[in-house]
Amino acid sequence: MFTSELIIKRNIKEKNSYELAAPLIWQDSLGVIITVPAGFVYDGASVPRVLSSIVPRFGGRYDRATALHDYLYTAGFLSRKDSDKVFYEALRSDKVRWVQARVLYYAVRIFGKKHYKKGEF
């Protein structure tokens, strides 16, 4: 579960991105804590343009989960598969509907490989 709120500011250096103004803290079901540092830049939900009306880049219940997931992919200290599992757990923790959480989870499983550990979102 998240133990902090998502506090962001628009990143004027990169189009369509935000910067964390404060750390974002996640604690998993085993008590492991992951801290996304203040200053981390992310681009929200990376979805194809055709789906952006259904899943906007920003503004959903999934915002904290997408920031966490982008950080996990950039940091690379968890495997891609484990990063995606944390993403799904974070989505459900923030009350994202089961169907939407599954769609987002499978989207990162299918299309996320090229972004893992590269910081290219």
Task: Enumerate the language-model features and the residues they cover.
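Extended terminal accessory/targeting regions
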Residues: 1-121
